[in-house]
Amino acid sequence: MGIFDDVNNWEKTEGAKIISSIIDVADPVILDYGCGAGNYSFAAAYAFDQKCKVYAVDINRQCLDYISEKAKSEKIGCIDAVEGREDYRQDFDSDTFDLVIYADMFHGEEKIYGGFHRFIMIEEAKRTLKKGGTLAVLPFHLSNFRDKDRKKSKYTYKKLIDEITEYGFAYIDNELQGIHFEKVYSPYYQQKGGITFESLERGKLLIFEK
C-alpha cells in the first residue's frame, strides 16, 4: 500500500475521528481554509457521513481541481472547492460556520502583510464562526513566525494560544494531533523519495471556542 492509500485511509479513520471529536453539531458547516489537497476537508466529510457542508478554500487552482476530481471519484457531494483571496479575507457571511480549520497556515512572510496574515485569519474566523463555533489551528514551522514587531520569532504553542485568546476565543485543552501533509504532495520530496506515512510530521491541534 502506497502513501496515498495511507492518506486516504487516514481521512476515513483517524482524521474523521479527530474532526468528529472537535464538534458535536448536526449538519455542520465547515471551512477548511488553505486546504491544500483537502485532507481535512475529506476527513470532515467522512466524520459526518457527508451530512455536512464543507468549503475547501485555497488560492491554488491545481489543489482545487484535485479536490473536485477526488470528491467526484469518491462520490462525495458535500465538499465545495472554492478559490480564495490573496488578502486572506473570506467571501462568506458572518456567523456562517460551526468549524473553521487552519492547518499549516500561520507561518512565513507572505507578500501582503509581511507575516501578519494570521491576525487577519483570526479576525475572519471570529467574524464567520457562529456563536459557540470552533476554531481548529494546526501550526507547523513554529521557528518561522513573525511577531507583532514583524521580526522573525520562534513561537511556542502557549504564545500562539495567548495571541488567539486575545481575540476573545476560549482555549480548550486537548490531546489531539494532526498531520503535516506537505511532503506527500511536494514534487521536491516526491523526487527525493523515502517519504512514508509514518515519517510525516505530527503536531498539536489547538482548539478554541468562539
Q: Model features per residue range: what roles?
A:
Residues N9-P28, A43:
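Conserved alpha-helix/loop element of class I SAM-dependent methyltransferases that forms part
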Residues L31, F42-R89:
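Class I SAM-dependent methyltransferase SAM/SAH-binding core
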Residues D27-G36:
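Conserved class I S-adenosyl-L-methionine
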Residues F169-K210:
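Class I S-adenosyl-L-methionine
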Residues G132-P139:
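Conserved beta-strand signature within the Rossmann-like core of class I S-adenosyl-L-methionine
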